[in-house]
């Protein structure tokens, strides 16, 4: 044991001697300590062992899926060891340098110079680093940052632009992180104070980062983007492009969380009309094309947020998506949890997405006309413009800042004008109060403003009052409290009608409101009457939807008797006075009235005797053409029951016209006779008056010779006037007589010509009928005789060749002679019958003519009846057989059938006679 210990000690002493080289001798003790610490520190050895251990593992490729985390931990541990060693080394060195034993003047001077150089280098670094570093450097308080910016005189310099960029980045990031439903309007105002055109990359990055960190506030960020997009569409487009790229990146990497956040943001942007619905349908199609559990989960989350909007704008697309989900549920092998998610999605759709509205309450902040929708497909290539996230020097920095200030002022002034209508109304009231000024004499002068400048805000207040009311009574109360002057009552009524017309569908609220105003004051009722006439005259200017709403509102006013039915006086139904728009208005108007009142009540109202003068244009009876047009119109719109009286009038119109003509003729004839008698009496009276006047003149001349010449001249003038009036009346009476005589002569000639033409037609028809009968009868007989001869000849040759007698031949000869004699008698009877018929017709015609000339003053209907009776008599006297059979046959077809049957019987009898004659002929006997 001792020998071993001595050997170890000896070996260690020997090693010490070898290690103590001249180089070690030249080094100072402090340097040797440092060398020893560096070479023999256990931390260094430990670090080298660990690194060697890591290298061995890297050679074996022993890393699993968590290798990145292991590397991260090892790097952190290595950094920690290095920092610890550096601190330990610095501590020891300071300790040795500060010891008085080892301090030398030369070394102290060297060390002092080194420390001074290090301090100056640190100061230089501190001057450069705070702002120009990559991450922005250390935190600089805002006051100090403003002071630093004020110290820089050149605002186009790199340092100033860098400072403003850092301030812009911090303010945008802070505002985006603070936004919520309650303060979004204030945040928008503060954001617009910053130059978001220059920092659009920073803004889009901040919004996407904030949404990814807190997806529960996605609807708030979507509303923020929608407001910014309405003023700066390029910023909204940039955010949407980056969202699409994030979704595609997450889909490629199978990053479910990134897909969920980005798809949810896209859904809310579509609800705010920033993104188009085609993008959403493409994303859903991509997710469900090759379904997995994660892709189905992302699709269902996306559908919950955008399903209600897609149902409205693209029902076919959403139906296809749900059909695909149903197919996946039934056919695919998916996890039970995902199956439950699909079933829940169908339940949400069945409930109408009531828990997932399109835009939550308080976030519908963009007007429809200000919205800007971007049509960006999913598969296109987009540039995310990441350069905008990094600072870049702008050579025209101050010019761009001034441009943005002008743009900001314009946007903020516009927003203030839209958000403060009440302030404008208040200022207008103040201006009205200031209109009352005083003269220099102290008298008060009232200035009336007739420029109607205040009419526009009053229209705005009316519209706001109407739209903010829950029911019509509250609205009427609000409008009456505004104290409109009488000159603006019609304007108020027009405003109510315009609000009703602008609705998508008719709302009964406006009809009830207008009815309430009509019941309150007569002026409102008269205003609505005038508006009805104006609207009907200019109905062609309205669109179909507005026309329908206006018609339904006026129908409500008429049904409730808020305005009188006399307003229908302006409606004239005819082909010339109506247009397509007016016919549509009348159609909707009366259909609404029939729906309110019912067809019987409406018909009774239209038949009201007191209102008939106002319905003359609506139900015209002046012209059969207009009457027929009105009947066809009401029948085509399903209200034919209103035209029963018009139909009766149209049926009886010819009769009424004839009776009116007859009355006119009789009145003309009576007036002519009266005028004759009056003319005779006038002539007698004129002669007697002339005689009396002459006698009076003579007496006056004899008695009073002192009459003045003026009175004589007056008398002469009056006499001349009387004579001229008598002549004019006589001429008129003569003209009337001549016209009446011409009319009566024409009518007589027309009646004669009509009767003659009718009688000639009847004669011709009868002659042609008799000729046809005779010719057909003879043709039948000849044909039958030829056929019978041939058939009898064959029959006789076969069966009766040996049976013939002379007696039969003689009988047949005599029978043939008798038959010829009968035929000649028939022809004579026919000729005699036709002559008798002609004579009877002439006699009846002469009787008819004498009767017609005798009863000339009877009506037109009596003449037609007598003419028809005489025609029937003449026709009935045509043949005795027809007189006997007339009580049996009423139809002409039956008479013809009997006639043909009679001819067929004659044909059979003649055939039998011919057969017998041929059989018993002497030629056959031979």
Swiss-Prot record:
Residues 413-441 have a biased composition (Acidic residues). Residues 1-11 have a biased composition (Polar residues). Signal peptide: none annotated. Residues 457-573 form the MI domain. Residues 12-40, 47-77, 115-128, 741-831, 841-860, 868-926 have a biased composition (Basic and acidic residues). GO terms for cellular component: catalytic step 2 spliceosome; nuclear speck; nucleus; spliceosomal complex; U2-type catalytic step 1 spliceosome; U2-type catalytic step 2 spliceosome; U2-type precatalytic spliceosome. Its main location: nucleus. Residues 169-352 form the MIF4G domain. The keyword Nucleus applies. Required for pre-mRNA splicing as component of the spliceosome. Promotes exon-junction complex (EJC) assembly. This is Pre-mRNA-splicing factor CWC22 homolog. The lineage of its organism: Eukaryota, Metazoa, Chordata, Craniata, Vertebrata.
